[in-house]
């Protein structure tokens, strides 16, 4: 929904939910404006309830989806096996869980590959799958703590550096804490600075300014992380390598700083706002919300924002590259998408009348809007559109490398009857990842495409599938226990 035009102080974000308005924070003295990259309102659909349908806790890494019939953990039986189940015997399930416990007690360096152990592919009961997930997450977190100590401990005055093997870019960041950690963990803001195609010293100055903006934006009970862009160019926050670096940063902070993975937000100003337009949809499964200030969308698309509350704030006089016009176009597009898809595309947008590139902190109204929302890691409906740098996974869907072309599109949802795919473009193989928080995995799982049944077959909860998800994504909320691989017509 479009926010009302500002006059003097920032206008409160109007909510259509229960007729209540969210009060705007009191802006402090404005920091110097970042460099970089009218009319107004909020489409505030009901926020996703905290933990809605979720299991518990964020991640990193590329995904390898097994082919159908490969014997991989969690693979569904062939189509036509309807009426049968892969229910685990209690004895076999308990034996597998005991074997996992013994395996994890071994010294890490001497462990054989988990996926090759007989217990890894044994069928688990629902209760034992939850216990296995807890054990595997605890072991993963211990490994992160053992191997990544040098990547954490950043402060407002001391930066830390993240480097991922095989990635030639590095990510430096400052961090500030506001308030106290709730029982569920800190909220996290990844706040991207302005600058862009400028000398390194200019971008360094913008980076140092971004950590100071925590005082004006004033997030509640949150970690405010200001990363330094890996390059000094116009696309500095949406290069291919940034996904892996941000994934790593999020996992580190979940493990070391007790960040709630369902309360991770991204925002940015100017060139940082350019990055939000790109990474908001591209890495949508990571975010509880995304806030764009004074940026330009370039060729990005909002379709994948179905489950990511998105805020847009631009000055009415910010005419460079038509930022003001593009902001209004995106705001109206999100409103249209929200009207067509009730419950999705929650948005807040405002073109601030009379304001140039620097909005004197009027965009701070985006912070309480974002923090009013919590990520649902297993939304019942998703829209996944691949962007310039495709990703291997999106919520509970995954695609192998040959099915990740730019522009590839999948619309899918699930309910108690099964999984329903309503639209597919340029995807021939797809993996549906499942947990007991989504469907009853003790019965056959039905999948249909445009109403035509593709399969109705049992699935198997396995330790191998749980471990693969945790190792790839570093988020216990994405620790799926079963999988249905599909070949689409």
Protein language model features and the residues they cover:
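Surface-exposed beta-strand/loop patches in extracellular or lumenal glycoproteins
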Residues: 425-443
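C-terminal catalytic histidine-bearing segment of alpha/beta-hydrolase fold enzymes
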Residues: 319, 325-327, 331, 335-420, ...
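Active-site machinery of serine-nucleophile hydrolases
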Residues: 185-188, 192-255
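Ser/Thr-rich, Pro/Gly/Ala-heavy low-complexity intrinsically disordered linkers and tails
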Residues: 1-86
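A domain-start/cap signature at the N-terminus of enzymes
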Residues: 27, 36, 55, 68, ...
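Primarily recognizes the serine-hydrolase "nucleophile elbow" in alpha/beta-hydrolase
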Residues: 262-306
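Short beta-strand/loop motif that positions the catalytic acidic residue
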Residues: 311-315
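Gly/Ser-rich "nucleophile elbow"/oxyanion-hole loop immediately N-terminal to the catalytic nucleophile
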Residues: 179-184, 234-271, 282-286
């Amino acid at each position: 929904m479009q926010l009302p035009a500002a006059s003097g102080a920032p206008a409160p974000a109007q909510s259509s939910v229960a007729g209540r308005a969210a009060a705007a924070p009191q802006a402090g003295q404005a920091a110097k404006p970042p460099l970089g990259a009218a009319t107004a309102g909020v489409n505030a659909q009901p926020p996703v309830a905290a933990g809605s349908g979720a299991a518990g806790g964020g991640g990193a890494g590329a995904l390898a989806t097994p082919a159908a019939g490969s014997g991989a953990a969690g693979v569904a039986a062939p189509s036509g096996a309807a009426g049968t189940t892969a229910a685990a015997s209690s004895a076999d399930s308990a034996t597998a869980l005991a074997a996992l416990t013994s395996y994890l007690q071994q010294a890490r360096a001497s462990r054989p590959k988990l996926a090759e152990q007989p217990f890894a592919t044994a069928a688990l009961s629902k209760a034992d799958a939850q216990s296995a997930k807890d054990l595997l997450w605890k072991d993963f977190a211990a490994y992160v703590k053992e191997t990544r100590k040098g990547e954490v401990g950043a402060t407002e005055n001391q930066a830390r550096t993240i480097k991922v093997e095989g990635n030639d870019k590095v990510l430096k960041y400052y961090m500030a804490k506001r308030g106290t950690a709730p029982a569920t963990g800190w909220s996290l803001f990844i706040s991207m600075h302005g600058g862009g195609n400028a000398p390194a010293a200019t971008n360094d100055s913008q980076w140092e300014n971004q950590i100071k903006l925590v005082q004006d934006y004033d997030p509640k009970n949150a970690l405010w992380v200001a990363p330094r862009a890996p390059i000094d160019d116009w696309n500095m926050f949406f290069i291919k390598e940034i996904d892996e670096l941000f994934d790593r940063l999020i996992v580190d902070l979940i493990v070391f700083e007790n960040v709630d993975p369902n309360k991770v937000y991204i925002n940015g100003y100017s060139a940082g706002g350019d990055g939000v337009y790109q990474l908001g949809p591209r890495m949508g499964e990571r975010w509880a919300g995304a806030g764009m200030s004074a940026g330009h969308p370039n060729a990005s698309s909002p379709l994948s924002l179905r489950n990511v509350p998105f805020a847009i704030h631009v000055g009415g006089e910010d005419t460079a590259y038509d930022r003001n016009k593009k902001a209004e176009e995106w705001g109206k597009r999100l409103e249209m998408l929200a009207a067509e898809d009730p419950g999705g595309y929650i948005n807040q947008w405002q073109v601030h009348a009379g304001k140039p590139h620097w909005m004197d902190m009027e965009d701070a109204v985006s912070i309480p809007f974002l923090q009013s929302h919590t990520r649902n890691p297993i939304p019942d409906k998703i829209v996944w559109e691949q962007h310039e740098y495709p990703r291997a996974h999106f919520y509970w869907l995954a695609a192998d490398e040959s099915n990740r072309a730019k522009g590839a599109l999948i619309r899918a949802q699930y309910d108690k009857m099964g999984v329903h795919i309503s639209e597919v473009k340029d995807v021939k193989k797809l993996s549906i990842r499942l947990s007991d928080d989504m469907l009853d995995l003790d019965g056959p799982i039905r999948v249909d495409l445009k109403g035509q049944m593709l399969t109705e077959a049992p699935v198997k909860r396995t330790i191998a599938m749980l471990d693969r998800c945790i190792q790839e994504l570093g988020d216990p909320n994405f620790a799926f226990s079963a999988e249905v691989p599909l070949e689409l017509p």
